[in-house]
């Protein structure tokens, strides 16, 4: 395929605002799934005031103070995304070991400080497994990912010289440089051999597939106390392990001015790994001695993540080229790798909960939680030249602006009930709502002064909508052993954009969003022993 197009159309892509990196990583590392023991999930997670479940260690540490017997529990699950498929050897259904923990209840006396409890719990905080596919999507006016590459090939109103030896290469992204190397954008020179701009490619459709897997594993260490069965207080220190993999396969049907078509393809692989730590404090009050009603409050500090990201980008265009030996090749391909270390601080979280029991046959719980996005930060370590170790970091003010412009406070509502159906048999039902984390016109901004700009290898982004979860379960209790089973249905939609071509306002994407369903089914089982 020859590199010749109607250059007059290129003016359509020269848009106003130009922008940079990754608020989407901040959201991924700030949110959490509804996970834990099957009993906890079966009640929609609304157990922070009711307490006496190992998984409440992560939502209100004081709830562990309600244990009167020691406890150990293990949970496994299976998750299915109905519209998923196999990609990168990741199946649509996958099993998971989701929880393992214990509580040691230490009785101190019959009055005053009655119990001092200690506990540990592992659970999967977030399961990143999902699959998105938009195949054969028509584009308007020949829009192509290369249009965004062309925008990125300009800085302060002038075209950048993208030849390998040029210092201008420091002012754009690896994506743009590889797009230039594969002729997806071609330089335009005037009669004086001066660079005046770039010509993009044109497409009549695109196909986009993305698979993600991995997760965030949470390890909680808890100390809690019970004062007179009326005041419960607790402290939890959380340690987090991040393992996130993303594989993207993108292609376009390109068309030239002779209506000849051929295929452009891009693949992007990304691995994000790291650790994090936070502190959670909680209190539960039973204000009326004769009443089982309880009121709880907890606060979670930001999770302080220390992360390493590695990306590999490959492009192959249908444009032929002739090498130095005079051999003509029918296509052009190029690749590149990037890596960056950075730190993320998730938002603060505040939780207000209430719960009560009716006799020995009904338990009711409800709670509200909020995480304010303005507390989130991205920072970069400042390494010592001598030993490479550092505790110092520099805040990314450019991404602070993006967080404020694109992310919203996330509100979570949980309600749940447990009823005694027969001796030792319990039924549970719950509902869980999480508000959308992104504002209406949020987008992946690839033009800021953020240091992350130099490591950007993707143009796609997904604006996630609100989450609705419905849960139901059964539990069986013996003198020591217990077993629980829960089904969870999660409904969520998102708007998928393969790339961003801005309108005159510099924000709104001209590329039409593609709706995607990220619904999933989850079945989990817990076995435990009290002693």
Can you annotate each of these PLM segments?
Residues 22-47, 64-82:
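Transmembrane beta-strand segments of Gram-negative outer membrane beta-barrel proteins
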Residues 57-63:
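N-terminal periplasmic accessory domains that precede
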Residues 41-55, 86-89, 206-212:
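Asp/Glu-centered strand-loop micro-motifs enriched in Gly/Pro and often flanked by an aromatic residue
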Residues 21-35, 40-41, 103-531:
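Outer-membrane beta-barrel porins/channels
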Residues 79, 90-91, 467-469:
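Strand-loop-strand
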Residues 1-24, 527, 531:
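Bacterial Sec-dependent N-terminal signal peptides
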Residues 85-100:
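Aromatic/His-enriched, Gly/Pro-containing loop or helix-boundary segments
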Residues 66, 80-85, 127-130, 244:
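Short active-site-adjacent helix-start/loop capping segments
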């Amino acid at each position: 395929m020859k590199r010749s197009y109607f250059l007059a159309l290129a003016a359509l892509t020269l848009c106003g605002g130009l922008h940079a990196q990754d608020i989407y990583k901040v959201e991924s590392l700030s949110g959490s799934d509804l996970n834990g023991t099957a009993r906890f999930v079966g009640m929609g997670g609304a157990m922070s005031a009711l307490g006496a479940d190992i998984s409440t260690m992560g939502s209100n540490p004081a709830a562990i103070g309600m244990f009167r017997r020691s406890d150990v529990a293990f949970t496994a699950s299976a998750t299915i995304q109905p519209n998923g498929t196999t990609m990168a050897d990741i199946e649509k259904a996958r099993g998971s070991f989701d929880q393992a923990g214990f509580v040691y209840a230490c009785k101190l006396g019959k009055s005053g400080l009655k119990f001092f409890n200690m506990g540990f719990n592992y659970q999967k905080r977030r399961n990143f497994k999902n699959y998105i596919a938009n195949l054969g999507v028509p584009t308007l006016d020949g829009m192509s990912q290369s249009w965004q590459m062309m925008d990125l090939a300009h800085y302060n109103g002038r075209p950048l010289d993208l030849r390998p030896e040029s210092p201008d290469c420091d002012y754009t992204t690896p994506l743009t440089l590889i797009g230039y190397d594969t002729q997806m954008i071609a330089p335009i020179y005037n009669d004086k051999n001066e660079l005046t701009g770039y010509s993009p490619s044109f497409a009549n459709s695109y196909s986009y597939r993305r698979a993600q897997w991995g997760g965030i594993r949470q390890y909680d260490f808890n100390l809690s106390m019970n004062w007179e069965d009326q005041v419960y207080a607790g402290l939890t220190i959380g340690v987090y392990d991040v393992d996130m993999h993303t594989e993207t396969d993108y292609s376009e049907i390109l068309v030239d001015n002779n209506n000849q078509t051929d295929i452009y393809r891009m693949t992007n692989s990304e691995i994000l790994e790291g650790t994090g730590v936070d502190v959670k404090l909680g209190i539960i009050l039973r204000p009326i001695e004769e009443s089982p009603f309880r009121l709880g409050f907890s606060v979670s500090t930001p999770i302080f993540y220390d992360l390493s990201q590695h990306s590999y980008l490959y492009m192959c265009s249908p444009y032929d080229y002739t090498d130095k030996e005079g051999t003509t090749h029918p296509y052009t391909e190029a690749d590149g790798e990037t890596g960056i270390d950075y730190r993320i601080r998730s938002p603060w979280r505040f939780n207000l909960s209430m719960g009560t029991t009716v006799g020995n046959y009904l338990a009711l719980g409800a709670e509200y939680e909020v995480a304010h996005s303005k507390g989130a930060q991205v920072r970069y370590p400042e390494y010592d030249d001598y030993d490479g170790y550092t505790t110092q970091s520099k805040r990314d003010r450019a991404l602070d602006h993006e967080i404020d412009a694109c992310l919203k406070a996330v509100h979570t509502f949980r309600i749940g009930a447990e009823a005694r159906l027969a001796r030792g048999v319990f039924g549970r039902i719950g509902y869980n709502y999480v508000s959308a984390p992104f504002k209406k016109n949020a987008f992946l901004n690839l033009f800021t002064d953020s240091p992350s700009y130099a490591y950007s290898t993707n143009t796609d982004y997904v604006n996630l909508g609100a989450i609705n979860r419905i849960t139901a379960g059964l539990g069986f209790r013996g003198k020591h052993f217990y077993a629980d089973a829960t089904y969870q249905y999660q409904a969520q939609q998102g708007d998928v954009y393969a790339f961003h071509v801005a309108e005159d306002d510099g924000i709104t994407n001209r590329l039409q969003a593609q709706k995607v369903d990220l619904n999933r089914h989850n079945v989990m089982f817990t076995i435990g022993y009290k002693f």
